[in-house]
Amino acid sequence: MTKITLLKGNFKSKLALSIAPTIKAGFPSPAEDYLHDSLDFNHDLIRNPEATFYGRVSGDSMIEAGICDGDIAVIDRSLMPIDGDIIVAYINGEFTIKYLDLSHKDDGYIELKPANSNYHPIRIDDSDNFRVWGVVAWTIKKWRG
């Protein structure tokens, strides 16, 4: 099971970085070879600081969703989870990150689905100590360095 270590962020600091207006995945345009805007992670990634936490991902059960070991998840506890969301769940004493599948709710259970075909869904019913701890709003990935 992919685990997540939860961390509280310091959202009072301001880090304004230059940002390009768009980054095209096709052919580059020489007319856009300049930066003219800025990005403040606390403003742009954090909608509700009091309800936002970071989590360091440990494991590979979400790799097909692009969430890998060592990535940082930005978790917003103020968001209402909906079917298909990537969530952080507390289940039987552990935190995990998975897709939320509510399609079996009328049958008395829900599933937490991995994004890795080597893992099976986790079936959750009333006998489990379970709660949705928060919704993953963003992920931060380290590619190099």
PLM feature spans:
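Short, positionally conserved secondary-structure boundary motifs
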Residues: 1-63, 94-95, 109, 118, ...
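Charged, well-structured alpha/beta interaction segments
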Residues: 64, 73-74
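Structural motif
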Residues: 70-71, 85
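Hydrophobic beta-strand signal
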Residues: 74-75, 88
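Short, compositionally biased
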Residues: 83-108
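Flexible, small-/acidic-enriched active-site or ligand-binding loops
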Residues: 117-123
